[in-house]
A protein has these predicted regions:
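Extended alpha-helical targeting/anchoring segments
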Residues: 1-271
Length: 271
């Protein structure tokens, strides 16, 4: 799915909401939740089985600190040194959906229903514009990215080890039963992250891949795991937990598979 020319963008950081659309920029000191809900209510597309699952809507990211708006009494305790927004969403009413298996592409333009005839003609014009982009535009020449400094972790090995020990103590005390520890790496970067994303698609095609650009922020990733998917009013999750290296032969593969299926920890992550 490719969305472009967003109809609006809503973002928030530390209760400062910013909405950008055709009317300009509006700012509010508030939780973003009510505004996001209102956007979802105002922009709904009818279900059409002939079209892909996604035909337009909000696309973007929610940061971990977004929990402050959805969990009463929760305020993040960690130091905000990355300066990411708590949420950044764009509303796309024009979408190109590629079906790589069938080798086809859907050109989708949404329209409002208050003036159906005029809006239908406008949607048709948008589709013709998309067709022209695909047929006539030359591929963009992207500058090959380059690291201008070495990758530097936020925590060294000793500090990370201390975090693991502390997490184990919290588990023993019953404060938590599971935790995901992470270590951010930073480096000076020059070039386009979209180039990196294209290489990622080529080298490691995955079920869940994304590229998102907003202002001076670019996000890209690839994962074999789709955390959650909404379809026909039902939520689907495809958790992956536990890995083992491949064996030297089929017999060793079967042994490792049996070990994985009987591992108490790995089984717990699926329940």
């Amino acid at each position: 799915f490719v969305g472009y020319d967003p109809k609006l963008e809503i973002s928030c950081r530390n209760y400062e909401v910013k909405i950008t659309d055709a009317f300009g920029v509006r700012r509010f000191s508030s939780s973003p939740q009510k505004y996001i809900r209102q956007i979802l209510e105002d922009y709904r597309s009818p279900k059409n089985d002939a079209l892909p699952d996604f035909t337009g809507g909000l696309v973007g990211f929610f940061g971990y600190d977004y929990a402050r708006y959805s969990v009463k009494g929760f305020e993040p305790q960690s130091q905000d040194d990355a300066h990411f927004k708590d949420v950044d969403l764009m509303l796309f009413d024009k979408v190109l959906a590629f079906d790589n298996k069938k080798g086809t592409v859907f050109l989708i333009a949404n329209m409002r229903t208050d003036e159906p005839q005029a809006n239908y003609k406008a949607a048709c014009r948008e589709i013709e514009i998309m067709r022209g982009i695909l047929e006539n535009d030359k591929p963009a020449r992207l500058k090959k990215p380059c690291l201008k400094s070495a990758m530097k972790p936020l925590f060294d090995a000793d500090q990370y080890g201390e975090m693991v020990l502390k997490a184990k103590e919290h588990i023993k005390e019953g404060d938590i039963f599971q935790v995901v520890l992470s270590n951010r790496y930073e480096a000076e970067f020059e070039g386009s992250l979209f180039y990196t994303y294209r290489e990622l698609c080529r080298l490691n095609p995955s079920p869940y891949m994304f590229y998102f650009s907003s202002g001076d922020i670019e996000l890209a990733g690839a994962s074999p795991e789709t955390l959650v998917k909404l379809k026909d009013g039902r939520l689907f999750t495809y958790p992956l937990a536990g890995t083992r290296k491949r064996g030297a032969d089929e017999s060793e593969d079967e042994k490792l598979q049996k070990e994985l299926l009987e591992d108490e920890k790995e089984l717990a992550e699926h329940n």
